[in-house]
UniProtKB/Swiss-Prot annotation:
The gene is argS. PROSITE patterns: AA_TRNA_LIGASE_I (PS00178). GO terms for molecular function: arginine-tRNA ligase activity; ATP binding. Keywords: Aminoacyl-tRNA synthetase, ATP-binding, Cytoplasm, Ligase, Nucleotide-binding, Protein biosynthesis. CDD domains: ArgRS_core. It comes from Bartonella bacilliformis (strain ATCC 35685 / KC583 / Herrer 020/F12,63). This is Arginine--tRNA ligase. It comes from the Bacteria. It is found in: Cytoplasm.
Length: 585
């Protein structure tokens, strides 16, 4: 149950049924009404902007309108107190019995508390990672991989039918470079001395085993084989080997895609998928023959001073028209991207989400233009960028050089610090902001390490139940909690904890609506901080401790509160795909 959404609906229902109308007697637009936690908990449990957003259309001062809205709500048995604050916000204080009922729901719902059906079974495609199959995943890929995976998990938790997709860029120039690099390692495996990797080829030693495997399979036959045939074999083996490596890298983070879509599929049957796409765009008036103006002070992809086949993307929001077919008749990378989107659209997804790296900033507008043109404005597309990850060790930058092949792989990082710190900390900044990842800090056992602090809160919760079994002789906590007298929880600190727990369904919905999975990581840390804070209060004041050996009734009520923490922390950590330990030493 989303307490905030429920009260928003209550307020809207009360207004609809009231005599409060627009200045000309019209019904009010209630869509901008929100209910949120107040900035200061001393101001109440909920705060609504209802009078602020309606005052102009009603023709009343916001504070005057607020008093009228308060009159509509004052008889609600779950409300303890209402007041007008500032220029017209309404603060709402709820009864303790209301919060006890919410806590009961948290206990009985288990880890399903916070689960919603706002997705209503809608089909959503989340494409993420989609790294070129030219080498192992490096630390820079971690962020988009985790963000995409957790966003997909959030959507599934909220009732969406999600497809996790990886687009394999296996038809471009980088594959030619990969094949040439592997052929060099093949010759090396046959005994040829390679003193230096030529400029422009991939220098990484990860290609050495691939060269050796080609020798085991073909001996020296590739050297005497028709060059085109040999190159085709090397490309095939190289792509397969790189994708196997990438899948294994992602598996270390427990990331598993449902679909791996090969770009080469678009070029099958004489590029039929691309030709069909261009035909569709042509029929709808989006394709023409022409010349693009030369770039001013910047490099324009695929620019040439000859007539080309162009996509009229400026008609659908792009900054400039885009080349589909070059003057020599070859298709651009962009043409394949358009065909790929068309394929997704024909798979009947209600929404398509792209999680992209920061280097794709210029790609978003053209992608949005493609979506409008292909779908006739029917497709819902969301694309967002993940900024760079900067790697540190104890505050000092870790130097990497892709040119020299000396980069830190995803697998290296997971092996050193573990999967959980990587997954959690990759969420611990907004995507738009660069993220600093310190290999030492993420394994510290301190409050300054968010993943430790959250997992430690979960483990502490379980330790409370172990204490209860020792001190209260509780044999079956689940049964005892079902009959716990939650009205024993009257301390403001305890009620405040219930407030914080009750924000979980709201956080889930916001993370989905705004496509911001970092909100979940932030919330889990705040929730853990609240729990640890209450634990520390119990150290200073024995009356606040969870277990009171001489008062089983109160102890059971407090155990109910602890169980709610276990449920919410377990649920959130499961979405993030991080372990929820029951014990930490």
């Amino acid at each position: 149950m989303n307490v905030f959404k429920n009260f928003e609906q209550k307020i809207k229902k009360s207004l609809k049924e009231s005599d409060i109308k627009g200045k000309n007697g019209e019904n009010l637009d209630l869509s901008k009404i929100t209910v949120d936690p107040p900035r200061d908990s001393l101001h109440g449990d909920l705060s609504t902007n209802a009078s602020m957003v309606l005052a102009k259309s009603v023709g009343l001062n916001p504070r005057t309108l607020a008093e009228k809205i308060i009159a509509l709500l004052k008889d609600d048995p779950s409300i303890d107190h209402l007041e007008v604050a500032g220029s017209g916000f309404i603060n709402i204080k709820l009864t303790k019995s209301f919060w006890h009922d919410v806590l009961k729901l948290m206990i009985t719902s288990g880890t399903d508390y916070g689960r919603t059906q706002i997705g209503q079974g809608k089909q959503v495609n989340v494409e993420y990672v989609s790294a070129n199959p030219t080498g192992p995943m490096h630390v820079g890929h971690c962020r988009g991989a985790v963000v995409g995976d957790v966003l997909a998990n959030l959507l599934q938790f909220a009732g969406y039918n999600v497809t996790k997709e990886y687009y394999i860029n296996d038809a471009g120039k980088q594959i030619e470079i990969l094949a040439a690099s592997v052929l060099l390692r093949y010759r090396e495996a046959l005994g040829e001395t390679i003193n230096k990797i030529p400029e422009g080829l991939y220098p990484g030693e990860y290609l050495i085993p691939l060269g050796q495997s080609l020798v085991q399979e073909f001996g020296d036959k590739l050297l005497t084989m028709d060059n085109e045939k040999a190159l085709s074999i090397v490309k095939e083996r190289s792509i397969d080997a790189m994708m196997t490596m990438i899948r294994q890298d992602l598996a270390t983070l427990n990331i598993h895609h449902d679909v791996f879509f090969s770009e080469r599929m678009l070029y099958m049957n004489n590029a039929q998928a691309i030709r069909n796409t261009i035909n569709d765009l042509t029929l709808n008036g989006y394709v023409y023959k022409g010349k693009l103006s030369p770039p001013k002070g910047q490099t324009l992809e695929d620019w040439e001073p000859h007539e080309q086949t162009l996509f009229r993307s400026t008609d659908v929001g792009d900054d400039q028209d885009r080349v589909l077919i070059k003057s020599d008749g070859s298709y651009t990378y962009f043409a394949a991207d358009v065909a790929y989107f068309r394929d997704k659209f024909h798979r009947h997804f209600d929404e398509m989400i792209y999680v992209l790296g920061a280097d794709h900033a210029g790609y978003v507008k053209r992608l949005e233009a493609v979506a409008k043109a292909i779908s006739g404005n029917k497709a819902k597309l969301t694309a967002f960028l993940c900024q760079l990850v900067k790697l540190f060790r104890n505050g000092h930058p870790v130097r990497m050089s892709k040119r020299e092949g000396s980069f830190i792989t995803l697998r290296d990082v997971v092996k050193e610090v573990g999967r959980d710190p990587v997954r959690f900390m990759m969420l611990y900044r907004k995507c738009e902001a660069p993220l600093d990842f310190d290999l030492e800090k993420v394994t510290e056992q301190s409050k300054d390490n968010p993943i430790f602090y959250v997992q430690y809160a979960h483990a502490r919760c379980h330790s409370v139940f172990r204490q209860a079994q020792e001190n209260l002789q509780i044999e079956n906590p689940s049964n005892d909690l079902m009959i716990a007298h939650l009205d024993q929880l009257t301390n403001d600190s305890e009620i405040s904890l219930i407030h914080k727990l009750a924000q979980y369904p709201r956080i889930i919905e916001q993370a989905i609506v705004y496509k911001e999975p970092h909100r979940l990581a932030f919330y889990l840390y705040d929730l853990a901080s609240n729990f640890h804070g209450h634990w520390n209060k119990g150290n200073d004041n024995p009356e606040l401790r969870f277990i009171k050996p001489n008062n089983k009734k109160l102890s059971l009520a407090r155990l109910g509160l602890v169980q709610a923490f276990i449920n919410v922390l377990s649920s959130g950590l499961k979405i993030v795909e991080v372990k929820a330990p029951t014990e930490m030493r």
